[in-house]
């Protein structure tokens, strides 16, 4: 998804809701998903004192600060994270998934065969998605029916198809009930569903902003929709002849520049990853992660940032973009990583520019803008969009009206 955002943004496609991030709760160190334990096994999370903190009066009081979202029948994911972080900062960690009680309660209505099948489901939940979590359970002698496991929020992710809604501002379908502001007309005056603000550039799945919770099945369906619209667009522009702004030789030089940088300088040092004339993508990745974790509302600060921290991280990202000119790749895998880290830096910058622009904390538990705590629905119940001007080399960030379609 990071490459999707970069490739579209660099040619001027309008982005939307890039401040939205997904910071899921996961089993610590192994990244095992918690959804099955909450929904299928009906497990509860406990603080370090063994208390079901989410059901406490203190939790209800804390959630009331974020009404109407915090007082809804179903607590939003970000606020569930907020409660977890609240316990940890109050010194009542770690947070444990009570697998022991959950399996014991389910076992009361099952025979031995059914219970064994249930325990197998617990393991398969990890083997289906994060094998490392199953390995971790083995390595730590963890049997979920006998020993609880620690959970905590992860590092932030940017995506538009799961529990996140960042991506491109795209056209809706050409139906009467769709507001004109939600339609993008092509040069022929027609509307093509899921076309970005750049004519002929389409996206789907993670690429579509303001449209989360599609997951795999919804993204697949959206992909089919987009494919049909692309065919329709191509037929309507049968005479169009695409022209590249660079020659094929220039494109090759650009794509393989990190390899040539490496070959020209690799003899200057005995350690392959330490060199006065280049930086490896792995080193740039750690540099970006350190900057964003410490200044961009990452794990190092319990997902908190403020105006000053955002100014600092923006300066750091500008330096990183400059230094990307000296990225070096010793093989094809590193060449891929070079381009990947460039895409990540641009994507992270768009994310933080949106947080910087939105003067509120829209998603407590996912991030906190401590200079603008709490939601401000009066002024910020809207989309935040941005556009990069490739010719001027400048960003423009602005509001976009939210039009309620479903009563």
Language-model segment annotations:
Residues 1-33, 209-212, 216-229:
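Glycine-rich loop(s) and the adjacent beta-strand/alpha-helix scaffold that form part
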Residues 11-12, 49-50, 227-238, 359:
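A generic secondary-structure signal for well-formed alpha-helical elements
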Residues 13-20, 233-246, 365-367:
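Acidic/polar loop patches that form or flank catalytic/metal-binding clefts of enzymes
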Residues 17-212, 294-407:
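Mobile, glycine/GP-rich and aromatic-enriched active-site lid/loop segments adjacent to catalytic centers
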Residues 189-258, 262:
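Catalytic phosphate/nucleotide-handling subdomain of diverse soluble enzymes
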Residues 236-330:
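Long, amphipathic alpha-helical stalk/connector segments used for oligomerization, subunit docking
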């Amino acid at each position: 998804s990071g490459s999707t955002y970069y490739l579209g943004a660099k040619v001027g496609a309008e982005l939307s809701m890039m401040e939205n991030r997904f910071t899921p709760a996961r089993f610590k160190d192994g990244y095992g998903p918690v959804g099955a334990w909450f929904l299928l096994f009906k497990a509860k999370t406990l603080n370090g004192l063994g208390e079901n903190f989410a059901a406490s009066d203190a939790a209800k009081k804390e959630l009331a600060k974020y009404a109407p979202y915090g007082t809804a029948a179903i607590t939003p994911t970000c606020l569930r994270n907020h409660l977890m972080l609240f316990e940890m900062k109050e010194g009542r960690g770690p947070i444990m998934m009570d697998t022991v009680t959950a399996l014991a309660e389910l076992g009361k209505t099952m025979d031995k065969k059914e219970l064994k099948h249930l325990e197998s489901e617990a393991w398969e939940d990890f083997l289906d998605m994060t094998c490392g979590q199953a390995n971790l359970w083995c390595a730590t002698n963890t049997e979920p029916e006998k020993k609880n496991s620690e959970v905590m929020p992860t590092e932030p992710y940017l995506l538009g198809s799961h529990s996140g809604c960042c991506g491109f501002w795209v056209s809706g379908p050409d139906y009467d009930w769709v507001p004109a502001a939600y339609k993008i007309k092509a040069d022929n005056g027609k509307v093509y569903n899921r076309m970005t603000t750049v004519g002929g550039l389409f996206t789907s799945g993670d690429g579509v902003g303001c449209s989360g919770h599609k997951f795999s099945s919804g993204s697949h369906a959206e992909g089919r929709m987009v494919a049909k619209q692309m065919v329709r667009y191509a037929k309507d522009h049968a005479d169009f002849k695409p022209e590249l702004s660079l020659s094929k030789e220039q494109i090759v030089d650009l794509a393989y520049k990190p390899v040539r940088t490496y070959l020209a300088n690799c003899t200057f040092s005995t350690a392959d990853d330490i060199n006065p004339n280049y930086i490896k993508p792995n080193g740039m990745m750690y540099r970006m992660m350190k900057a964003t974790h410490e200044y961009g509302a990452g794990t190092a600060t319990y997902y908190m940032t403020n105006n000053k921290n955002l100014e600092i991280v923006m300066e750091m990202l500008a330096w990183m973009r400059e230094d990307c000119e000296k990225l070096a790749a010793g093989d094809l895998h590193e060449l891929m990583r070079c381009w990947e880290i460039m895409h990540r830096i641009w994507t992270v910058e768009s994310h933080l520019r949106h947080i910087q622009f939105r003067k509120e904390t829209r998603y407590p538990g996912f991030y906190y803008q401590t200079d603008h705590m709490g939601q401000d629905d009066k002024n910020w119940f809207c989309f935040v969009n941005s556009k990069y001007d490739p010719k001027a080399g400048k960003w423009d960030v602005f509001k976009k009206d939210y039009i309620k379609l479903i009563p």
